[in-house]
Amino acid sequence: MNSYLNIKINGKNLEKKADIENAILKFDEDLKENPDDEATIVGKSVLLYKLGKLNESLNCLNQIENIRNVSIIELKAVILMGLENYKQALELLNEVLKVDNGNISALYYKTECLFQLKRFNEVVDTANVALKIDKNHQSILINKFCSLVELNSTKEALKVKEKLLRLGLNCNI
């Protein structure tokens, strides 16, 4: 997912729940001294996300006023997607894409949101834009394929499936 989700603290990848919880406590200590530090807020939010505490993660990010960093906006969208708030996530992803229309991860997440909202034609359109940037993006190709199936566009769906198979994706689709 987003680069924030692979955060490393003190050069150590945080995988164990206890390590993550200890890191959150350290972030809390830092936030007492500097409550507006975006990097600390984002770090804590990411770790809460990693623990599956999505509401807390979102509340943490909501402490940042006037978010301008598109990576943070995208992170917020990912959290909203985890909370199944696809409409609001889509709005944020569109904000990201206004700033950087070639942001492949935002385009991918947008196809995910649109699919969940059953806006299949828009999934295909967004996928086509994204595939001009990264023609072999498997997750986007899968979303395009599934949307074409939903739209009963069998011939076009089969072309996408063939491409996925050529890319070596072992799929039962």
Each model region followed by its residue ranges:
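Register position in tetratricopeptide repeats
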Residues: 16-17, 50, 82-83, 116-117, ...
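Short coil turns that delineate tetratricopeptide repeat
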Residues: 35, 67-69, 101, 135, ...
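Canonical positions in the second alpha-helix
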Residues: 29-30, 63-64, 95-96, 129-130, ...
